[in-house]
Regions:
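Conserved beta-ketoacyl condensing-enzyme motif
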Residues: 3, 46-110, 115, 242-263
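Flexible, glycine-rich active-site loops centered on histidine and acidic residues
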Residues: 126-161
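Claisen-condensing/thiolase-fold acyl-transfer catalytic domains that form or cleave C-C bonds
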Residues: 50, 54-57, 81-82, 100, ...
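Buried hydrophobic positions in well-ordered alpha/beta secondary-structure cores of metabolic enzymes
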Residues: 3-5, 31, 60, 74, ...
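Acidic-glycine-rich active-site phosphate/pyrophosphate-binding loop
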Residues: 24-33, 84-98, 135-144, 204-209, ...
Length: 334
């Protein structure tokens, strides 16, 4: 299976580090250096998650020079917080794109959803004869950030955008050599919007709590301090082993946005140099779309060339971890 082409949509509006610092009452240098945010895209009036997914998908189809009629499946990784509640988006993406013959599904692993979608797509190609699968998502969880809540400081980077990947059975493109996944159920309830579900239905009184919250900040910090970086390294190593490589063979690491020290810790753990990755300090965190954005930027900056070995690594609250090993074969990807 190959990643044949990619698409990214980013809103024009930006929130700078200065505004984040002002809202959160933090020193500017803490936002820039510790949190690793110089600026991030924020949504305009028309930038709804499913719409942004459509715009990114259109770019991916153009990049591969393929029409929507060629798609066998549409896998939507549009974020759970989206245009409408209790709404599946794969049919909408197919309708908007004109993929009338495609089958579809929605998939949600929070910020690890792209890796889950690659796993499902690989299975569809192996067992269902699929030849072309579109994975597309949109994200604007920045709406759910309460900058007055210091316990959610690690979420201040949440941004907005759309991303898509066109997967094909044949190349050229980034061949998916291996996938690896891990899950830590100890953090199952750690991060969530506490109102608006069946346990605490939305009401006028509950509106002020319609933000992402951390249930037990001290317990979550202790757990992540002990497990986060080691688990990132383990899942990447598992993917490398499945592909028959070691970290010494890697040319590029596409890593989701995280605080600057954590990004460096993952690179150091793999023995990689800083120039072998792109730190998304001008984009913030686009959730499950970070690896797509990183691959697009790496191609533009010449960090991925023919034969390059690439690792993707992600994590999503819940907690999910995932990694993939890719190799560019048969020409550049769009």
């Amino acid at each position: 299976m190959f990643i044949r082409s990619l698409g990214i949509y980013l809103p024009k509006e930006r929130m700078g580090a200065e505004e984040i610092a002002h809202r959160a009452k933090l020193p500017l240098e803490v936002v820039k250096e510790k949190l690793g945010i110089l600026e991030k895209p924020i949504p305009g009036p028309a930038d709804h998650p499913a719409e942004m997914a459509v715009w990114a998908a259109e770019e991916a189809l153009r990049g591969a020079n393929l029409g929507p009629e060629t798609l066998d499946w549409v896998i939507s990784i549009v974020e759970e917080y989206k245009d409408y509640p209790v709404w599946a988006t794969a049919p909408y993406l197919a309708q908007r794109l004109g993929a009338k013959g495609a089958l579809g599904m929605d998939l949600n692993q929070k910020c690890a959803s792209f890796l889950g979608a690659l796993e499902v797509a690989r299975g569809l190609m192996a067992t269902r004869g699929a030849k072309a699968i579109l994975v597309a998502g949109g994200y604007r969880n920045g709406d759910l950030v309460d900058y007055q809540d210091p316990h959610t400081r690690f979420l201040y980077d949440l941004a907005a955008g759309g991303g898509a990947a066109l997967l094909t059975r044949e190349g050229p493109g980034l061949r998916v050599l291996s996938l690896a996944h891990r899950m830590d159920p100890e953090l199952a309830l750690a991060v969530k919007v506490p109102v608006g579900g069946t346990r605490t239905p939305l009401s006028p009184e509950a509106l002020s709590e319609f933000y992402l919250r951390v249930e037990d900040p001290q317990a979550m910090k202790a757990r992540l301090d002990a497990t986060s970086i080691p688990t990132f390294l383990k899942v990447i190593q598992e993917a490398l082993e499945e592909a028959g490589y070691t970290s010494e063979d890697l040319d590029y690491l596409a890593l989701l946005h995280m605080k600057r020290s954590a990004h460096r810790a993952v690179l150091e753990g793999l023995g990689l140099r800083e120039e072998q990755s792109i730190y998304l300090e001008r984009f913030g965190h686009l959730g499950q779309l970070d690896p797509i954005l990183s691959l697009v930027l790496a191609r533009r900056e010449g960090k991925i060339r023919e034969g390059s070995l690439v690792a993707l690594a992600v994590a999503g609250v819940g907690y999910f971890y995932g990694a993939a090993i890719l190799r560019l074969e048969g020409g550049v990807y769009a």
